[in-house]
Each structure stands twice: as structure tokens, then as C-alpha cells.
Amino acid sequence: MKHTLRYAPIAAALLLITSCASKKAITDGTQLPTQTSKTDKNAEKEAARQSLQFVQRIANNNVATENILTSGDFTLQLGSKEITVPAKLSMRKDECIRIQLLMPILRSELARIEFTPNYVLLLDRYHKEYIKASYSEVSFLANNGLSFYSLQALFWNQLIAPGAKTITDADMKKFVADGAAGSSRVPGTLKAGNITYKWSVDAATALIKGADITFKSAAHGTSSLTWTYNDFNTVGQKKFPTTQQFGFSTNYGGSNHAAQVTLQMASPKTSTNSDTKTEV
């Protein structure tokens, strides 16, 4: 409100000048279009300033700890089929994201999904099989420009800087946060080539409540990854979402494919008691 009042006299003066210029144009043809353009530029600068300020608030919510360990339930939905098993989530910043799927009651490991900066690992303990591949070899990740650091930002409830480990001050200026609507959610957007990133952010707390990544290509069709966050608990003096749901869909190859995963976690800890890489 203070910013609006600060610019009100300027806007009023420009309106008056523009009005006088219109009358003068009738008599001698003189026009002063620059006055309107100055008003527009002032409005654009103020909108950009408010957008950057809000993006900085989002970044200030980042959990500062290096490790997050938690247990809970993992639910996978493929079409009409749904399965829920106990699970563990272990994350070490810039090194590893690991989801372990456990056998009910016995809690022995059934499968493991692991992301590191260099590879993706899918380990099936039950059938004694595994797939280990680089990000360029996993078509959905490669086609959508998703790297380890993109996935890390999503799991850690943070903004994504495409192709970078962290978001710099210069990167923050590329985001557009539109708080003009005055609603409880502020939409944020970032475009990078064929990929559009969108976030839904709580206006009061600046916590990210949802993220949507869409990739459009003539060669690979349209793919999307949608992430929602709920049930925020305190982790390292910051808020971390203990319920995360992410769904991905693609029509790559002319066929529609979709899946949805829900992670429900309890009491996240910041312990370092976990290996950073799985030996296979």
C-alpha cells in the first residue's frame, strides 16, 4: 500500500500532463507520447521489484540442513491400479535422493529408487534385477530437461534454476511472481526454451504449494510433471512438506502414459546416518 501511495502523485501529474497534451494536439498537432511511456515504465519497474522481492521470500524458506531422513508410505497409481507400501526417504544435499520400498510388517527392502548427479538407479531386490542409467538415457527426464538438481529442488520444495545447482541473484530476476490478483496463491513462472515452469505459492507464507513443468516439442510431443506439497513440518528451523504427490504424463511416441506417486512422511530427521551411493 505504501508503494502505491508513493507513486500516486506521479501518476496524477502524468495524467494531468497527458490531458493538457491532448487539448494542445487539437490546435497545433503536438503530441507527448513519452509521458504515457514513462508511466508504463514506472509500473513495470514496480511490478518487477515486487516480483523479485516475493521470489526472494520463497528462496528464504529453503531448508538449510544437508540431510533429510524420514519414513512413511509410498503409493503408486497406474491407471486403475494402486499399491501402497512402507517406505524410507533419504536425501543428502547435492549428492543423493533415495527412496526405499519396504515389505509390509517385515520391512525388508523390496526395491530402491536412487538419484545422484551422475545416474538414476532402479534396484529390484525381489527379482534381483537393476537398471542404472545416465539422465540422457532416461527418455522422460532427458526430454523434459530434468537433471539431478531439478529433481532435488522438487523434492526439497524449492525453485528450479534450469541447468544450475543453485539459484543466484541473477536467476531470481528471471522468475515472474504475479501477486497483483490479491488471492491466497501467487503464481510464479519461468520459461527456458521449450520448457515452462510454474509454481503456486502461498501468498502469506511464501511456501511453494505446487509446481508444474511442461515440455512441448514437435519431436517428443507434450510431457508434464506436476508436484503438490502439503502437511508442512519444521525441519532445521524451516518448513518442509511431509506429504508430496507427483504425477507425470507424456504422449511421447503417440501413446499416452501417466503415473502418480504419493509420499507421506512422518517426523523428518537431519541425521547423516545413510550411504550416499548404492553399490550394485
What are these regions (language model features)?
Residues 1-9:
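Bacterial N-terminal signal peptides that target proteins for export
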Residues 16-19:
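C-terminal motif of bacterial Sec signal peptides marking the signal peptidase cleavage site
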Residues 21-81:
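N-terminal leader/targeting segments and the immediate start of mature chains
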Residues 22, 26, 167-279:
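Gly/Pro-enriched, hydrophobic low-complexity segments
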Residues 60-68, 78-83, 90-92, 113, ...:
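Edge/loop elements at the starts and ends of beta-strands within beta-rich repeat scaffolds
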Residues 96-149:
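An acidic-aromatic
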Residues 141-149, 153-173:
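C-terminal low-complexity, charged extensions that often adopt amphipathic alpha-helices
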